[in-house]
């Protein structure tokens, strides 16, 4: 693990009781304020064993920052310091929106989980585009993904994704189409086959001429087998670069925290088994033809390795950092090297689907 990540982990361990005593959203905003002045990262954590290629992009290591942490692209420049091999910002909508009323973010400390009902709060694509353009001029040592969504009050949500593509694709290494948040009423209906086909056709038509960017699709974990089959069929037919499995769940396994009754999407440790099963289900449904990115409940190298062996080419983390500290990505990446060597793989990417 880098000295930078080690030092910040040590500082976070001291500050954790105070952080956990603070309102979750306020603590997050303080974290962003602390990260924003950091210098731009010039190097990424990588090695021949960790480097991974997907969708024509080179990822220095397979551990990425999930969207939601840096909604407005304010701290992407600093995140490679903490070991991330790629960074995904957003979700960004065409117009700024406040999101749902507060409180809307709850830490379930006893369960090592989070419930959120943020509702795509963000400053809009125009403001974020200015920051990302500046970042692009100075360079970033890892791929940058931009996660796009629809405004809550939009009269045409499919058109919102086309607008987002036109605005953000020129600045992105890849785009993620997020139709899986449970906190925007009706959004998950866009996972239905007909709606998904129309949405992806609109996204494709809005891509920059001659410079189309890879498109990833982020799906919910609360899907029936027939839904998975339909999504896989559409993804393969429309040439999607990958599917991200998965977003938060509306299901409620047994939880100890008093916040368990709060409405919203559940992430963190209780999501891990369901998210792993989703990777396995999408791998089986696609026959290994559709690249997958795993998210949901990953808090260790062992869990990341399990998702990779189940069929994921990359992994993303966010919620676990609240409990494990900012050096989590670095620890996972270095741990993946150890696990790959233990199991006889020359590269982590060689293990993708090895346990499927």
Swiss-Prot record:
Major localization listed first in the record, in broad terms: membrane
Active site, UniProt feature: 181 (nucleophile)
A Gene Ontology term for the protein's cellular component: plasma membrane
Secretion signal span: none
GO molecular function, one term: dihydroorotate dehydrogenase (quinone) activity
Keyword match tRNA-binding: no
Cofactor(s) essential for the protein: FMN
Catalysis performed (reactions): (S)-dihydroorotate + a quinone = orotate + a quinol
GO biological process, one term: 'de novo' pyrimidine nucleobase biosynthetic process
Enzyme Commission number(s) of this protein: 1.3.5.2
InterPro entries in UniProt: Aldolase_TIM (IPR013785), DHO_dehydrogenase (IPR050074), Dihydroorotate_DH_2 (IPR005719), Dihydroorotate_DH_cat (IPR005720), Dihydroorotate_DH_CS (IPR001295)
List of residues binding substrate: 71, 116-120, 178, 183, 247-248
Broad enzyme group: oxidoreductase
PANTHER family: DIHYDROOROTATE DEHYDROGENASE (QUINONE), MITOCHONDRIAL (PTHR48109:SF4), DIHYDROOROTATE DEHYDROGENASE (QUINONE), MITOCHONDRIAL-RELATED (PTHR48109)
NCBIfam families the record matches: PRK05286.1-2, PRK05286.2-5, pyrD_sub2
The name this protein goes by in its record: Dihydroorotate dehydrogenase (quinone)
Organism lineage string: Bacteria, Pseudomonadati, Pseudomonadota, Alphaproteobacteria, Sphingomonadales
Gene: pyrD
């Amino acid at each position: 693990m880098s000295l930078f990540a080690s030092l910040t982990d040590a500082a976070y361990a001291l500050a954790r009781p105070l952080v956990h005593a603070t309102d979750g959203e306020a603590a997050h905003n303080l974290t962003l304020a602390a990260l924003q002045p950091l210098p731009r990262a010039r190097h990424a954590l990588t090695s021949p064993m960790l480097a991974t290629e997907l969708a024509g992009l080179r990822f220095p290591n397979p551990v990425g920052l999930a969207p939601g942490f840096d909604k407005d692209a304010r701290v992407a420049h600093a995140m490679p310091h903490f070991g991330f091999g790629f960074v995904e910002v957003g979700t960004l909508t065409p117009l700024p929106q406040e999101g749902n009323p507060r409180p809307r973010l709850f830490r379930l400390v006893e369960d090592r989980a989070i419930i959120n009902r943020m509702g795509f709060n963000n400053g809009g694509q125009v403001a974020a585009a200015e920051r990302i353009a500046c970042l692009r001029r100075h360079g970033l040592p890892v791929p940058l993904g931009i996660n796009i969504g629809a405004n809550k009050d939009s009269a045409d949500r499919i058109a919102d994704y086309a607008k987002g593509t036109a605005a953000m694709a020129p600045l992105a290494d890849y785009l993620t189409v997020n139709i899986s948040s449970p906190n925007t009423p009706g959004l998950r209906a866009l996972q239905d086959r007909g709606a998904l086909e129309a949405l992806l056709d609109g996204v494709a038509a809005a891509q920059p001429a001659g410079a189309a960017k890879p498109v990833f699709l982020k799906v919910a974990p609360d899907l029936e087998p027939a839904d998975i089959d339909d999504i896989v069929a559409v993804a393969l037919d429309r040439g999607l670069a990958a599917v991200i499995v998965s977003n938060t769940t509306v299901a409620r396994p047994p939880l100890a925290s008093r916040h368990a009754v709060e409405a919203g999407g559940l992430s963190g440790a209780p999501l891990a088994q369901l998210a792993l099963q989703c990777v396995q289900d999408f791998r089986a449904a696609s026959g290994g033809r559709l690249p997958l990115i795993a998210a949901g409940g990953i808090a260790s190298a062992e869990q990341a390795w399990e998702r990779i062996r189940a069929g994921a080419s990359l992994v993303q983390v966010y919620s676990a950092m609240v409990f494990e500290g900012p050096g989590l990505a670095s620890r996972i990446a270095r741990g993946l090297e150890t696990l790959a060597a233990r199991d006889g793989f020359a590269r982590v990417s060689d293990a993708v689907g090895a346990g499927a």
